Amino acid sequence: MRLLSLLSVVTLAVASPLSVEEYAKALDERAVSVSTTDFGNFKFYIQHGAAAYCNSEAPAGAKVTCSGNGCPTVQSNGATIVASFTGSKTGIGGYVATDPTRKEIVVSFRGSINIRNWLTNLDFDQDDCSLTSGCGVHSGFQNAWNEISAAATAAVAKARKANPSFKVVSVGHSLGGAVATLAGANLRVGGTPLDIYTYGSPRVGNTQLAAFVSNQAGGEFRVTNAKDPVPRLPPLIFGYRHTSPEYWLSGSGGDKIDYTINDVKVCEGAANLRCNGGTLGLDIDAHLHYFQATDACSAGGISWRRYRSAKRESISERATMTDAELEKKLNSYVEMDKEYIKTHANRSS
């Protein structure tokens, strides 16, 4: 495991065989736009992201269902559970389902039920990963994928065998987006062509991982919303990078859901701060509203209560943080990221 300290950030970045600027420049040269098909898919696949919150224990053969109008099109399409799975250690959950109307196999992962706990107690540890040389991945996200990878992979294989002409899609909201990214990357390596759709996903790993996933065959659609704080974490200064491109819903945030295609701004680059990454604030409503209420079918919704049962002293201390203190902390990360990118760019010029 790599424990990344703030003092080691510059050394880590300079030692990287693929610099931030080189990778960002290469991606910036690509012409990326949003088609009406893309936009329609953004609005559709978030329904699967929402459905994962209330179908992760559904039996095989059951229809995907959501309360709170969480997945109306998925339901009307007759999507059927192939397998569901939960991780007792990490709390990850999700399902694999077939959609006979769209002729698709969807593997979907839910996010954290208590997003405040995650924001408050986030660690920045990275583990080595085997996807590519120099690959580093957030240890928590890797542990979550490891816990359910066998079940998810077997379910996708079973669904493909029964429906060989169906397209495969990996979907996730919030922390589920991070796991969907790892699932998609690993399934592709295993020979399963697929597209990845994530909503409000945090950064998953280092430059090498971000470059590897972004350059795999298959669509990569990472959607962010206004000032959602989750995609700004873990910070760039701790060696984390995003997959590219980013599709940013550049509206007012909050509980806004009526976005149009003209509201979508595309930003390229693993370390870009031109879209969501450069925003400030603690707009949790933006995290919970991607074209709809993403927690509509979760019993009681996604919690914003403080963490009260920490077992580690360091976690317990952070758990006493007020919302104002948490917002200040997250804003400080963004400012440090901006300064880091500015300084690194000046050294490269």
UniProtKB/Swiss-Prot annotation:
SS bond partners: none
Glycosylation sites: N346
Null mutant phenotype: Leads to reduced extracellular lipolytic activity and to reduced virulence to both wheat and maize. Strongly induced the deposition of spot-like callose patches in vascular bundles of directly inoculated spikelets.
Record's keyword terms, sorted: Glycoprotein, Hydrolase, Lipid degradation, Lipid metabolism, Metal-binding, Secreted, Signal
Secretion signal span: 1-15
Catalytic residues as annotated in Swiss-Prot or TrEMBL: S174 (nucleophile), D228
GO molecular function annotations of the record: hydrolase activity; metal ion binding
Function: Secreted lipase that acts as a virulence factor that represses the vascular callose deposition of the wheat by releasing free fatty acids. Has a substrate preference for p-nitrophenyl esters with a carbon chain length of C14 (p-nitrophenyl myristate). Does not hydrolyze triglyceride substrates.
Catalyzed reactions: a monoacylglycerol + H2O = glycerol + a fatty acid + H(+); a diacylglycerol + H2O = a monoacylglycerol + a fatty acid + H(+)
InterPro entries membership: AB_hydrolase_fold (IPR029058), Fungal_lipase-type (IPR002921), Mono/diacylglycerol_lipase_N (IPR005592), Sec_MonoDiacylglyc_Lipase (IPR051218)
Top-level taxon in the UniProt lineage: Eukaryota
Activity regulation text: Ebelactone B, a known lipase inhibitor, represses the lipolytic activity of FLG1.
Cellular compartment(s): Secreted
One Pfam entry name: Lipase_3
pH dependence, entry free text: Optimum pH is 7.0.
Gene Ontology CC entries for this record: extracellular region
Protein name: Secreted mono- and diacylglycerol lipase 1
Triggers of expression: Expression is induced by lipid-containing substrates and repressed by glucose. Expression is regulated by several transcription factors including MYT3, SAS, and gzzc258. Expression is detected 1 day post-infection of wheat spikes. Transcript accumulation reached its highest level in 6 hour old cultures.
Species the sequence originates in: Gibberella zeae (strain ATCC MYA-4620 / CBS 123657 / FGSC 9075 / NRRL 31084 / PH-1)
Keyword Glycoprotein: yes
Gene Ontology biological process: lipid catabolic process
EC numbers for this chain: 3.1.1.-
